[in-house]
């Protein structure tokens, strides 16, 4: 009986962990710019310390929202341009290229691996950045 109770408690606690939720393209509104999120290659999401899931339409909006928010962040997510799946923002490699327009016009796309980013760089000249470099770049939608 005690073992069953411990298992049930563990299951309940794991259900409380909040990660990103799938972005509903064509329905969700960007938490930063309020535009409807349309392009599944560029979405992003912040999960606040309180578990609020804040969808964004681009990496640029995510950067601005995080910089302006007074809420603590639990996790940050960006969409891998290749697979269209949410990946951790801190581990992604970013391509900044004027040849690959993003929803807010800054030309930033995210990739799960350096190899994928380098493949995109061959098609869309620009520069590759990691999360720290991207945050320090001063990129903004303003």
Residue map of PLM features:
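Short, flexible active-site loop motifs that bind/organize anionic cofactors or intermediates
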Residues: 6, 51-52, 106-107
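C-terminal motif of bacterial Sec signal peptides marking the signal peptidase cleavage site
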Residues: 12-15
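Residue-level marker of regulatory loop/turn positions in helix-turn-helix DNA-binding domains and
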Residues: 22
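Short metal-coordination and nucleic-acid-contact micro-motifs, chiefly zinc-binding Cys/His arrays
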Residues: 26
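Post-signal-peptide N-terminal segment of Sec-exported extracytoplasmic proteins
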Residues: 31-70
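Thiol/selenol-based redox catalytic cores and closely related redox-interacting motifs
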Residues: 74-142
